[in-house]
């Protein structure tokens, strides 16, 4: 996609920043670079909320492979072990991409945090606690684009009601190589033979509030725009690594244990991979612990790659990416067209009387305040968010799952007056012009009442 599209997505997501009712819903983005070369070892996005927890850990010293029979895998591998999450691994010439997505995840309206780190095999000396960007690029061989996003993306976030300016200095912190994410919940170990250097932007704004963010948060928004909302992890296969991912998912999955030692057909760089998956359900707390480990090891000497190779591994019963597949739990007949026509007419009437957009469905878990619109013959109840946007939500639509599959399903119904915004995770209706509204003012309420009676008759006959 073009940069202008990314700017639009960033502005849209910035406008709903932190609109979830739970302040614990957050996307943490991490960029880990190699000391000496500045090359990127890992970029990852980890989603967590009050129940979903994710931890990722990268090691560069991988040790010895477990004893397993080695296999060659080529092109596409389908392993149906999960029926309720989308889990896939893709390996090409130099990148391994790992993606885990559950329909319990709603990344609309969450806050973003960015974390820039450099991995070192030894502790460095003479590192100042505060450094500017030019010193960081010289000392750690990073490029400026690794540290800060382009100005146009910062401007897009500011148009979306955030407050961000480019920082000039960064606080440098050092620790042993350890897990990233919700470590306090899942508590993996740490590696005392490798060091992580973190670069934290220093705010240069005199006054800050909950809309004030640093540039790495905007970089995280950009990464989510590029990933199409689906958090994933990518690791460079140009060197040894061990990537471990711990997840706590708020649903019960079936117990699974898989170990595979394999090479990729067509890979002339002579790399060996090891994959371990352990899925441990807990029926009492209605959650599942999912542990995934991928090891990449080069069999020296490393030969220069002569031919491209690719391997995709799908571990889900879903035949399509989870963000576009239609959940069979709600077929198209689940929302009657007569009901949709009735409520769409009411929504249009309400929007026209207010002369502003009305949101009729949202994925965002917002804190709303009630309001009333007196129309003489009747009073309509609605809701407002903190930004005075109007909501006229339906209990019937709220019964559908709050995820992007529902958005895709509602989009497929093709109601002409609906404006579906996948980036914001909402559906809205715009008002008609005032001249049209006046001509229809006397007709709408009586027509709506007639349609409501038809709906009641239809439901009554269907329940018999």
UniProtKB/Swiss-Prot annotation:
Protein name: Non-structural protein NS-S
Subunit structure: Interacts with host MYC2.
A Pfam family reported for this protein in Swiss-Prot or TrEMBL: Tospov_NS-S_N
S-S bridge residues: none
Annotated function: Multifunctional protein that plays two independent roles: viral suppressor of host RNAi (VSR) and viral inducer of host attractiveness to insect vectors (VIA). Acts as a suppressor of RNA-mediated gene silencing, also known as post-transcriptional gene silencing (PTGS), a mechanism of plant viral defense that limits the accumulation of viral RNAs. Also inhibits signal transduction by the phytohormone jasmonate, making the infected plant more attractive to aphids, which are the second host to play a role as a dissemination vector. Acts by binding to and inhibiting MYC2 transcription factor.
Statement: the UniProt record of this protein carries the keyword Oxidoreductase: no
UniProt entry keywords in alphabetical sequence: Host-virus interaction, Inhibition of host innate immune response by virus, Suppressor of RNA silencing, Viral immunoevasion
One GO-annotated biological process of the protein: symbiont-mediated suppression of host innate immune response
Family note: Belongs to the tospovirus NS-S protein family.
Nucleotide-binding recorded as keyword: no
């Amino acid at each position: 996609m073009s940069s202008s599209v990314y700017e639009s997505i960033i502005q849209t997501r910035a406008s709903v920043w932190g609109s979830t009712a739970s302040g614990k819903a957050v996307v943490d983005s991490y960029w880990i670079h190699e000391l000496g070369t500045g090359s990127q070892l890992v970029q990852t996005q980890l989603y967590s909320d009050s129940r979903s927890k994710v931890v990722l850990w990268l090691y560069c010293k991988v040790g010895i492979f477990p004893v397993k029979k080695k296999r060659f895998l080529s092109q596409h591998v389908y392993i149906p072990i999960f029926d309720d999450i989308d889990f896939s691994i893709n390996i090409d010439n130099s990148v391994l991409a790992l993606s885990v997505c559950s329909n319990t995840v709603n990344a609309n309206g969450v806050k973003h945090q960015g974390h820039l780190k450099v991995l070192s095999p030894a502790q460095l000396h003479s590192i100042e606690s505060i450094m500017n960007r030019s010193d960081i690029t010289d000392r750690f061989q990073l490029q400026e684009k690794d540290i800060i996003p382009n100005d146009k993306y910062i401007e897009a976030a500011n148009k979306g009601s955030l407050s961000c300016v480019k920082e000039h200095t960064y606080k440098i912190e050092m620790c042993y190589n350890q897990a990233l994410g919700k470590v306090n919940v899942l508590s993996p170990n740490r590696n005392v033979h490798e060091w992580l250097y973190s670069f934290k932007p220093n705010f240069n704004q005199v006054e800050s509030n909950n809309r004030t963010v640093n540039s790495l948060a905007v970089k995280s928004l950009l990464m989510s725009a590029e990933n199409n909302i689906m958090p994933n992890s990518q690791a460079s296969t140009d060197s040894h690594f061990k990537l471990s991912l711990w997840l706590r998912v708020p649903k019960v999955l079936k117990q699974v244990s898989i170990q595979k030692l394999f090479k990729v057909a067509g890979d002339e760089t002579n790399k060996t991979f090891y994959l371990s998956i352990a899925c441990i359900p807990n029926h009492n707390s209605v959650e599942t612990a999912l542990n995934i480990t991928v090891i990449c090891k080069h069999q020296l000497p490393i030969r220069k790659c002569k031919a491209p190779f690719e391997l995709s591994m799908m571990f889900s019963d879903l035949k399509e990416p989870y963000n576009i597949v239609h959940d069979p739990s709600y077929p198209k007949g689940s929302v009657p067209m007569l009901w949709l026509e009735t409520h769409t007419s009411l929504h249009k009437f309400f929007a026209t009387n207010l002369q502003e957009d009305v949101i009729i469905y949202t994925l965002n878990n917002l804190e709303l305040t009630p309001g009333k619109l007196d129309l003489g013959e009747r009073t309509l109840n609605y809701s407002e968010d903190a930004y005075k946007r109007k909501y006229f939500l339906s209990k019937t639509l709220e019964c559908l799952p709050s995820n992007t599959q529902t958005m895709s399903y509602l989009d497929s119904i093709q109601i002409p007056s609906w404006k579906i915004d996948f980036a914001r995770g909402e559906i809205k209706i715009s008002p008609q012009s005032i001249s049209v509204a006046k001509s229809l003012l006397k007709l709408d309420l009586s027509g709506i009442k007639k349609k409501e009676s038809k709906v009641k008759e239809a439901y009554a006959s269907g329940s018999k």
